[in-house]
Amino acid sequence: MAGGCCGIFQRWLSIFLYAIGIGLSSFAYYIELKKEADENYVALCDMDEFISCSSVFNSTYGKGFGLVALVTGDEKHPLNQPNALYGIIFYSLLGLFYLCSGTSRFMANLQFFSFVLANIMSCYLAYILYFILKTLCVVCVSTYAVNLLLLMLSYCKRRSLRKRTPSVMETFQRGPTLPGSFDFKKNI
């Protein structure tokens, strides 16, 4: 495959990171459900009052990114779901898109811009984590790292596909070629 940062290693690393993203989001969702059911539940990632993931997951910012209830004015709005549930859906869909995309430039662009958005949201949530909640969530920081790595890998894939395949406009400008015809510009 073309490109120094792309190839079989990139494919397996991407699949591994999608699985890690699904696993971290599922773990966060599990902790949130357990904490809602039992206030005395202590999660594995709750080490002290400063390092506590369950306090973050059960805060107002742990559902709907802290934005849905603010915008709709309704805590029980159907979109005001745990952030972890959004993470499970996000990583599952993009992982599926990744497995099915092959050499599609459209899918590579979709993945890249999805991870640009995910990293913007990661910065927003990291700000809330550090400056507003004043705590550290190991699971949250791990998902931020997964998002950053997947952004880098999607950029590599997008760049390698841009080098290998012509755009629609380039193909259109070149014009149709008949079977068996010889293109002097291309073959010399």
Across the structure, where does each feature detected by a protein language model lie?
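Membrane-interfacial helix-loop segments of redox and metal-homeostasis proteins
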Residues: M1-I188
